[in-house]
UniProtKB/Swiss-Prot annotation:
Part of a complex with ERBB2 and EGFR. Part of a complex with phosphorylated EGFR and GRB2. Interacts with phosphorylated EGFR and PDGFR, maybe indirectly. Interacts with GRB2. This is Phosphatidylinositol 4-phosphate 3-kinase C2 domain-containing subunit beta. Residues 805-981 form the PIK helical domain. Residues 1050-1328 form the PI3K/PI4K catalytic domain. The lineage of its organism: Eukaryota, Metazoa, Chordata, Craniata, Vertebrata. Residues 2-298 are annotated as: Interaction with GRB2. Activated by GRB2. Residues 1192-1200 are annotated as: Catalytic loop. Its main location: other. It comes from the Eukaryota. It is an enzyme of class 2 (transferase). Residues 259-270 have a biased composition (Basic and acidic residues). One of its GO terms (biological process) is cellular response to starvation. Keywords: ATP-binding, Cell membrane, Cytoplasm, Endoplasmic reticulum, Kinase, Lipid metabolism, Membrane, Microsome, Nucleotide-binding, Nucleus, Transferase.
Length: 1634
């Protein structure tokens, strides 16, 4: 009775992990014996002695990355770590696993006195920093299970593998295989490693209970009811328990509390086949990353060789136990091993002169002529601890930084003889970066930023020895061994997929026991065979549910059994009565299983390999160029088929194709159509050979094999089968690509398993993609490539010794013209077959056209071995390409290794600042590399080692790439390689950044999902957890930039936006006390990768303009995606959205012209300040128009366009681009080419009439547009490299075609100027844009608070009774006529206040009186307000009589207003209205002089007619005359503006055949045309005799047109060899000159 009770307690303790009593009893009864513990102890002692004598490559103690020190009792703080990695941060790799150190039964192994179950010392600091942990595991409050012994409830003690229960002698030691006495049990992280958390007595007690169960007579009872399905499930659960991350553990914990297991397994199915839906997929455990016998350098020669599973020779019944069948493998993937070797060389080859300087973030440098000019002076303020007051210097932009340091040291040191300038650095205040001493001041981006926005340049002088160097690499970092595989393991993964060595050993022990029983049986062979089949099925299921033909054939030799389909050929049962016959069957079956294990280990890169002697290694090599056989292989079957396919599809077939750079090498081949088959599992078996009509020696080295699985859908029941068969279309179910030549350039041979990607994902035949083992239930394709006695290797041919080069000008003019037309396409995507043929034929003439190399190489007819010498010599002799053009050679179209190596060589000249501009594209280009190691990878790693800014952004871009399932494996290795190259301090910094991002993401998600009324409280609570993060870590750099170092959060300045995504508005405390708080927006729910890409393109555009001497004054803010659906955005200070500016004039403010001008006037009251703001507005508005049009940015409303008080306009929120406009039914929401409205034109013109400033604006737009057009190839290259990034709106060539069409590279500059001018006119005249703004105003009214109505649009501040003084009397003195910004009247009001005898005078327009009254009506009932004068006037509303009448009415209104009830008369609106503005402070004695609305040109006194701007050129017997602008035309006699147009004749012209004219501009004295008028067929000699007559007329409808001015231009006086542009004076009759 007591025994039974104890047994029940034992099972109860183990049920916590979801393993039933029956399952665990069966597993233990068959696999475990107590005497294995003594053997394990003996093995461990020998293994420990071996490790002490020969340390492993990867040291768990040597890296010693300090963890965050935790004071005792701070478990709640440490619990915050849970979630970064998705696993328990208390896992101590330095502790012994149960397998390494078995418990001592005589001594308790409980915690030592004073020990804390949480780690106090240093763990591996690398443990956390790659994980997202967005599951919400970050918590600061202890839960009910967060007590000291809670960890002991998570799992039972581990179950070590036991020897066979049969009395069979062990195998003698074999050659090449360690003996059983020397086999050590490795520390596999996949198994339970909780000895440090489990008291020794409890472990001892449970093992003793196990002993009782096994030895108490229950063994036979248990054996009689063996359930192999249950065993498989139990082993799977054991494996999952040791490999799943913290999220699964939390889910399991919830399940235990609900009375169910952590995994929802089905009920007992004894005797039934293992169903696919009931078994978990194979899991990928953390590998055993170092050989226990030594590192890579001193390992024995045969230790890490691939070992083939050879058939077992004799005595299969004496096969070794499961744990002896497999040995630890350090690195089975040869490509990864070679990559690790390259990484070691790269780390050792980095020559660092001063390790201290590697911890600096250097300010980016982008030199340009403007910033280096001597004529540009800077006012710089330098602060220093040695000085009580700051120093102010005035120096040139071209002055170097060390010169400024020297000048400062003159004030801080009396004697400079012992002072080295190089020991000092200058740090911008508020940023954790440093200016580069040897570079000019003006070349630093920080200085350029300050100049652009008129910010004071404030620098701090610091000694290098006091600068924090926590990110610097050290000598120890370079000397420590590479931990690539360890870092790969730490990265976040889905469900682990590879079975562990212990679990597989346990399954093999079961198999061996059943085989022994089958061999020793005297009868009842079908039942014994069924148990063998069940054990084989369990092994195959654990090995990715793969059933090879050898296994199927071997099983067919067994008698029929219910576990599988009956074999086609029934065997005579009497044959198996002979023991030798049974041994032959078992021998074949064992060999087939070991072959499957070897295949599985090679495919999934497991941490072990079969310990069977023999290894296939080819010493003979045959060059592929001499191998003339056709490419052939056998498609056997697909494994792991979803059961739902059996009821949804039929007639499965596989389509195979060969491609190189996206181009198919031959027609695809298809297998026959097959149906489902059922052996051990469901399969689709073809077993068919595919033979391509392509010889191996004609295959390019980077040839990809693409296999696509198709099937026909089963017609629905009740439908006509014949009719449906005719209409059925095959559906693609999955695809996979694999290179035919591996990284050693050897042709693929042998059996391969390839995981299929779902057909819903992109099928990129143009690039390499790893097989899909990322998804645990992916369908697996088995292909058998032929094997041979030698390796077939692709050897790179040498280039030809000679390649002709010819001058482009030596071609015929017709050929030159055709080639130029082709080259103007700027991109290889739109080359036709005829274009390619012509380019390749004339390739030797194209050397002078450097940028055409990608087009020429894309036209190569073949990339086979025989064609490479000609291509390589062309590449070698090509003129050095600039880095912008070389980017085009990194596209998927060019997989050739030599081409990509040359491209990287040319890109190598990039500066660090330029590299950052193109880094996202280079990270995407890594997808197009065929192999893990490549010149591009080495280039990026080398640059990351030398610059922290590059390292920072490279890390976050690679981390984002982990989300790309097709390339996650590659990005895992690259990210691990980057972290290997980093120092310990930088790895810890990345760890903190990820931790902070996860905490913010959790908070943002909680605020977003909460009810609006509860959001503020949730935000405040969540910010406390962020404060705990900073209390624990001190400081952290923001992912936006490594220069932004913060030390805390400012809760009072944090809030959220009332939009759909509810982003957080956060304010961080700057570490630098001289800097301001850093304000950012954190978004959760929006994919910011598109915003990142758009801002990158705008930043590159801005740099192009600046380099060309045209600073468009663009506002570029930082934006970075820190994961899918979340990221950070920099907040621009002193900026407001157009919506908030416009609604200050009411909800219909979008239809008014003055809101923007009034807002800028309010914030820039001085005349000079306002003029500067308008100038900034003109430039930035022009830049925004060009950028948004070229990139096709849509969804433009007045809430994602912002304006700074300095006049700089910029766009935000780029959720739609490349023309993907939001639709209302079939109507596009964005109807105009870009946003350019009348209120923007009002600011530019200085009123509602066009002025010459508008000419400047149009010229700026056209000039900026043409400069971007010159770099069309750059933007096509950059966007083309991003086609595979996963952004939905940039996924195919149609999206790229939008940019191509917008840039119009085939147009001349003149045509492009005309084209963009028409776009400006179209946008300005669009009513849809204003209507869209108005609709958005209405939609946002629910988010507008009442405080938004308490300010006046023309007042920059709010004034009160207390601040201004009580008003005693007001009187409207007079009205005055004004001409700027519009013609009208202004009213002068005298304001008297108590306790003062001086009156103040204010000037207000009628519209401003009306705004005051409208906003008062929103606050008070109409009964408390005086009546306001009517705005409706019959006749002219701006006449003198109307103004006089309104003066009297307004005088009465304001008198009654100040005598209204106190709540009205004393409100802030009234006192703000009567408070003087800066414009009121001017002298009020005289009327202001009329001012022209044209701020840049005034008509000279006595001169009539104005001026016209023309551009005249002559080419190819054609005269081109571009009419650009006219300024200063006279008004008509009735005082109205004219409707001018231009008419020209080419005299002499008696027949009036040369008449040309422009369109009519309506109601303007300063029209813009930008129209090209062309005269064709005019010989150059005839041109000297001609005279151009130009007339400007005003169209008068039915009346005669009025002449406004004309000019005659003698063409012989112009040198038309070059284009002539200038202004010509208009008169009644005049001859014009420039």
């Amino acid at each position: 009775m007591s025994s039974t009770q104890g047994n029940g307690e034992h099972w109860k303790s183990l049920e916590s992990v979801g393993i039933s009593r029956k399952e665990l009893a069966m597993a233990e009864a068959l696999q475990m014996e107590y005497d294995a513990l003594s053997r394990l102890r003996h093995d461990k002692e020998e293994n420990r002695a071996k490790q002490n004598a020969d340390p492993s490559l990867i040291s768990w103690d040597e890296p010693g990355v300090d963890f965050y020190s935790k004071p005792a009792g701070r478990r709640t703080d440490l619990k915050l770590l849970r979630g970064l990695s998705g696993s328990d941060p208390t896992l101590n790799y330095n502790s012994l696993s149960p397998q390494e150190g078995p418990p001592n039964h005589s001594t308790s192994q409980g915690p030592q006195p004073g020990s804390d179950p949480w780690p106090k010392g240093s763990l591996s600091g690398d443990y956390l920093y790659i994980f997202d942990g967005s599951d919400g595991g970050v918590s600061s409050s202890p839960g009910p299970g967060d007590i000291e012994g809670s960890c002991k409830k998570l799992s039972p003690p581990p179950l070590p593998p036991r020897a066979s229960i049969w009395d069979t002698p062990p195998l003698p030691p074999r050659k090449g295989s360690p003996s059983s006495s020397k086999i050590s049990q490795p520390s596999d992280i996949n198994t339970f490693s909780l000895v440090e958390q489990l008291p020794g007595k409890l472990l001892e007690h449970r093992i003793l209970e196990e002993e009782e169960v096994l030895g108490g007579g229950g063994q036979g009872r248990l054996l009689g009811s063996v359930d192999y399905d249950g065993i498989n499930d139990a082993i799977t659960r054991l494996n999952l328990k040791s490999t799943y991350d913290a999220e699964m553990l939390r889910d399991a914990t919830r399940g235990w509390k609900e009375g169910r297991g952590p995994l929802d397994f089905s009920k007992d199915t004894s005797g039934k086949p293992v169903a696919r839906s009931k078994t978990m997929p194979p899991q990928v455990p953390p590998r055993t990353y170092a050989s226990r016998y030594g590192n890579r350098k001193n390992a024995t020669p045969g230790k890490n060789r691939r070992i083939s599973a050879a058939p077992v020779g004799s005595r299969p019944h004496t096969v070794a136990n499961g744990h002896e069948l497999f040995e630890v493998s350090e690195e089975r993937d040869e490509e990864v091993a070679a990559f690790c070797h390259m990484l070691d060389i790269l780390r050792s080859g980095s020559d660092i002169q001063d390790y201290f300087l590697t911890g600096y973030v250097w300010s980016a440098v982008t030199p340009s002529p403007e910033h280096l000019g001597d004529e540009v002076n800077l006012k710089v303020t330098v602060l220093c601890d040695r000085l009580q007051e700051a120093l102010t210097f005035t120096c040139n932009c071209s002055s170097t930084v060390d010169l400024l340091i020297y000048q400062t040291l003159c004030y801080t040191h009396d004697d400079l003889r012992n002072v080295d300038v190089g020991d000092f650095v200058l740090k911008p205040c508020g940023l954790e970066e440093f200016l580069q001493n040897k570079h000019a001041l003006g070349s630093h981006e920080y200085i350029q930023y300050c100049r652009k926005f008129d910010i004071d340049i404030r620098l701090q002088l610091m000694e290098q020895k006091v600068v924090r160097s926590d990110l610097a690499r050290t000598v120890n970092d370079d000397q420590s061994p590479s931990t690539l595989n360890y870092l790969v393991h730490l990265q976040e993964r889905p469900v682990k997929q590879t079975i562990s060595r212990q679990a597989l050993s346990l399954l093999f022990d079961t198999y061996h026991n059943e085989v022994d029983a089958f061999l020793l049986a005297d009868g009842d062979f079908p039942l014994k065979a069924d148990r063998v089949v069940q054990s084989v099925k369990a092994i195959c299921n654990a090995l990715a549910a793969v059933e090879t033909p050898e296994i199927t054939s071997a099983l067919n030799q067994l008698p029929p059994c219910p576990s599988r389909m009956q074999p086609k050929i029934q065997k005579d049962p009497s044959v198996l009565a002979v023991r030798e016959n049974r041994e032959k069957v078992v021998e074949a079956l064992t060999a087939a299983i070991l072959d499957l294990v070897e295949l599985y280990c090679n495919t999934f890169n497991a941490d072990f390999q079969t310990a069977v002697p023999g290894s296939r290694k080819h010493d003979l090599v045959q060059e592929a160029c001499h191998f003339a056989r056709s490419l052939a292989f056998t498609v056997y079957a697909t494994h792991r088929i979803p059961i739902i396919w059996a009821t949804s599809y039929e007639d499965f077939y596989l389509s195979c194709s060969l491609s190189h750079g996206g181009k198919e090498l031959c027609s695809p081949l298809q297998t026959r159509r097959a149906h489902f088959s059922k052996y051990l599992f469901h399969l689709i078996v073809w077993d068919q050979q595919i033979c391509f009509p392509v010889q191996v020696n004609r295959l390019p080295r980077e040839t990809l094999l693409c296999a696509t699985l198709y099937a026909l859908p089963i017609p629905p029941p009740g439908s006509s089968s014949e009719a449906n068969k005719q209409r059925r279309v095959p559906e693609a179910l999955g695809w996979v690509t694999t290179p035919l030549f591996n990284f050693r350039q050897v042709l693929t041979c042998g059996r391969k398993l390839l995981g299929l990607w779902p057909a819903t994902q992109e099928n990129p035949s143009a690039r390499w993609s790893a097989p899909n083992f990322h998804q645990p239930d992916s369908v697996i394709l088995q292909i058998d490539f032929p094997t041979s006695a030698f390796d077939i290797k692709f050897t790179s041919p040498p280039g030809d010794k000679f390649s002709p080069r010819y001058e482009f000008g030596s071609l015929r003019e017709e050929d030159q013209r055709k080639l130029k037309d082709i080259m103007q396409k700027e991109s290889l995507y739109w080359l036709t077959d005829a274009d390619k043929k012509r380019l390749w034929e004339k390739r030797y003439y194209c050397h002078s056209e450097v940028s055409s190399l990608p087009l020429v190489l894309a036209s190569a007819p073949s990339w086979e071995w025989a064609c490479l010498p000609d291509i390589y010599v062309l590449l070698k002799q090509w003129t050095h390409m600039n880095h912008q053009d070389a980017l085009g050679l990194l596209h998927a179209t060019f997989p050739d290794q030599e081409v990509r190596r040359m491209a990287v060589q040319w890109i190598g000249s990039l500066s660090d600042a330029e590299l950052l501009d193109y880094l996202p594209q280079l990270v995407q280009a890594l997808k197009y590399e065929c192999y893990l190691d490549s010149p591009l990878v080495r280039f990026l790693l080398k640059r990351a080692v030398s610059d922290l800014r590059v390292t920072h952004y490279f890390f976050w871009l690679l981390k984002d790439g982990l989300k790309d399932s097709q390339f996650s494996i590659r990005y895992q290795y690259l990210l691990a390689a980057l972290l290997c190259c980093c120092g310990k301090g930088l790895r810890e910094e990345f760890n903190r950044q990820c931790w902070l991002v996860n905490a913010l993401a959790k908070l943002a998600q909680q605020v977003r999902e909460a009810a609006p009324s509860a959001r503020q409280g949730i935000l405040r609570t969540g910010l406390e957890e962020v404060k705990q993060f900073f209390a624990l870590n001190g400081s952290c750099r923001l992912p936006l930039s490594p220069s932004l170092l913060v030390k805390g959060i400012v809760p009072r300045d944090c809030s959220y936006f009332n939009s759909n995504a509810v982003p957080l508005k956060l304010s961080f405390q700057n570490v630098d006390p001289l800097g301001e708080n850093i304000r950012v927006i954190f978004k959760c729910g929006d994919d910011l990768r598109q915003d990142m890409l758009t801002l990158q393109m705008i930043r590159i555009m801005s740099k192009i303009w600046v380099q060309e001497g045209l600073d468009m004054r663009m506002v570029i803010f930082r934006c970075f995606s820190t994961g899918r659906g979340r990221g950070m955005v920099e907040m621009i200070p002193n900026a407001e959205t157009l919506r908030k500016i416009q609604v200050e004039h009411g909800v219909t403010g979008s239809f008014k012209d003055r809101p923007l001008a009034d807002w800028l006037q309010k914030h820039n009251p001085g005349e000079d300040e306002y003029e500067k703001a308008v100038e900034n507005f003109i430039y930035s508005c022009a830049g925004c128009c060009v950028a948004t049009y070229v990139l096709g940015i849509c969804d433009r409303h007045n809430d994602n366009i912002m304006l700074k008080t300095t006049g700089h306009m910029f766009h935000i929120d780029f959720g739609r681009f490349l023309g993907h406009a939001q639709m209302f039914g079939n109507i596009k929401r964005d109807r105009a080419p870009f946003v350019f409205t009348s209120d923007m034109a009002y600011v530019i013109n200085g009123g509602d009439k066009p002025s010459s400033r508008f000419h400047d604006f149009v010229d700026l737009c056209c000039q900026a547009y043409n400069l971007i057009r010159k770099h069309t190839h750059l933007f096509l290259n950059l966007l083309g490299l991003m086609l595979s990034c996963g952004i939905p709106e940039l996924s195919d060539l149609e999206d790229l075609k939008y940019v191509y069409d917008a840039l119009r590279p085939q147009d001349t500059e003149a045509n492009a100027t005309t084209y963009f001018t028409r776009l400006i006119e179209s946008s300005l005249g669009s009513v849809a844009t204003k209507l869209n703004f108005f609709i958005h105003n209405l939609a946002q009214m629910k988010f507008t608070g009442s405080d938004d109505r308490l300010t006046l649009s023309f007042a920059s501040r709010t004034h009160t009774l207390k601040s201004s003084g009580r008003i005693s009397d007001v009187f409207l003195c007079r009205h005055e006529k004004i001409f700027h910004p519009n013609k009208g009247y202004i009213y002068v009001v005298k304001v008297m206040r108590e306790n003062t005898h001086e009156a103040t005078y204010i000037q207000r327009t009628f519209e401003e009186f009306q705004e005051l009254h409208n906003k008062l009506r929103l606050l008070f009932p109409s009964s408390h307000l005086p009546s306001f004068p009517s705005r409706f006037v019959i006749g002219r509303s701006r006449g003198e009589a109307v103004a006089e009448r309104r003066r009297e009415e307004l005088n009465g209104y304001i008198w009654h207003l100040i005598h209204a009830p106190p709540e009205v008369a004393e409100c802030d609106l009234v006192y703000t209205f009567f408070h003087p503005l800066p414009r009121d402070e001017k002298a009020m004695g005289t009327s202001p002089a009329p001012k022209s609305s044209d701020g840049t040109w005034a008509r000279p006194v006595g001169k009539v007619g104005g001026e016209v701007k023309l551009s005249i050129s002559y080419k190819n017997n054609k005269l081109f005359i571009m009419v650009m602008h006219i300024r200063g035309l006279q008004l008509l006699q009735d005082g109205n503006d004219p409707d001018p147009y231009v008419k020209i004749y080419l005299l002499p012209d008696p027949q009036k055949t040369t008449k040309r004219k422009t369109k009519v501009a309506r109601k303007t004295c300063n029209p813009t045309y930008n129209e090209m008028l062309v005269y064709d067929g005019i010989p150059k000699g005839d041109l000297q005799q001609r005279e151009l007559q130009l007339s400007v007329l005003s169209e008068q409808g039915f009346w005669e047109n009025v002449l406004l001015g004309e000019v005659n231009i003698r063409l012989r006086e112009l040198d038309l060899a070059q284009e002539k542009t200038g202004w010509f004076a208009l008169g009644s009759r005049s001859h014009g000159t420039l």
